[in-house]
Amino acid sequence: MSIVETCISFVSTNPFYPFCTGLLLNCVVTPLYFWKTQNGRIVVVSLLQFVVLYATAFISIGTDKSLYRNKWVALPLSKKTRISRNTSLYCFKLKYPFERLHIPMGYHLAVRVTINGERLVRYYTPVNVPNTEGHLELVVKTYKHGVVSKYFDKLKIRQYVEFKGPLGELEYDQDTATELGIIAGGSGITPVLQVLQEIIPSPEDLTHISLIYANETEDDILMKSQLDHMAKEYPHFKVHYVIHKPNGKWNGDVGYVTLEEMKRYLPKQAEDHRLLICGPPKMNEMVLNYAKELGWSNGFHKGNGTDKVFVF
């Protein structure tokens, strides 16, 4: 294949095709002019012009990205994976295959869908591993009376959903906490997972983290393999599961999160300790009351980095 054919093939199959077409014509015409006289010059001219062409297109990502705080962008569903009896992992394709989403820890996205002519907005936290390229991943649990979650459950590949963000208030400073206690319930694990992925692998951040993760049944535990892998790989992270309706083989904690479990598994209230809570409203309210009894000051939602307790 000639250098010209290679350029045409490469550009026509990459995300900048519409942008590059005009510049490619100039790249093609020039080497054809020199083909019979200076074969070496053909390659030099082609490569130089192609580098300029592609670099210019690469810079254009900054002005045409997949997420904005102040406007909606539609992205297509590219993959859907069932991860539990009522929960799926949804993968949406970004505009560019090597685009990375820079979503601050603990932040979420606004998601908009149209159902029966009505636009509905919900908020979800991406579960992308840091530096993931080309796609956005969401974990969505389908609820019996959840209009939007049931809409997600019926999504087809290449169907579009609108996104806006990132949005949020949590600000984490690794210098403010030596120990971090986290209580998550159900799908509330998704923003927590984002926090864990940011802190735990960092060699500069050795904050000790203890997580209590509560669910209705063992089958409802989301991302369990990931959590167990983190706990095995990083000794400064511990995870404890609580199941409301266990099966016969379950040998962990049973029921709802209790005051005693918080005392047993989570760090005590201290100046350099923090507590994060993310779950259903009733669970959050109950856990906040327990936190009061344990000496934590609560009711914080600002997330300015000095709050002792933060509720997602």
Swiss-Prot record:
GO term, biological process aspect, one: ergosterol biosynthetic process
InterPro entries: CBR-like (IPR001834), Cbr1-like_FAD-bd_dom (IPR008333), FAD-bd_FR_type (IPR017927), Flavoprot_Pyr_Nucl_cyt_Rdtase (IPR001709), FNR_nucleotide-bd (IPR039261), OxRdtase_FAD/NAD-bd (IPR001433), Riboflavin_synthase-like_b-brl (IPR017938)
Keyword terms of this UniProt record: FAD, Flavoprotein, Membrane, NAD, Oxidoreductase, Transmembrane, Transmembrane helix
Enzyme Commission number: 1.-.-.-
Topological domains annotated Cytoplasmic: 36-41, 201-312
Cofactor(s) of this protein: FAD
GO CC annotations on file: membrane
Pfam families documented for this protein: FAD_binding_6, NAD_binding_1
GO terms assigned for molecular function: cytochrome-b5 reductase activity, acting on NAD(P)H
Principal EC category: oxidoreductase
Phenotype reported upon loss of the gene: Increases frequency of mitochondrial genome loss.
Residue intervals passing through the bilayer: 15-35, 42-62, 180-200
Protein topology in the membrane: Multi-pass membrane protein
Annotated FAD-binding FR-type domain residues: 70-173
Ranges per topology, Extracellular: 1-14, 63-179
Location(s), subcellular: Membrane
Keyword Flavoprotein recorded: yes
Main localization category: membrane
Family named by the database record: Belongs to the flavoprotein pyridine nucleotide cytochrome reductase family.
Descriptive protein name: Uncharacterized oxidoreductase AIM33
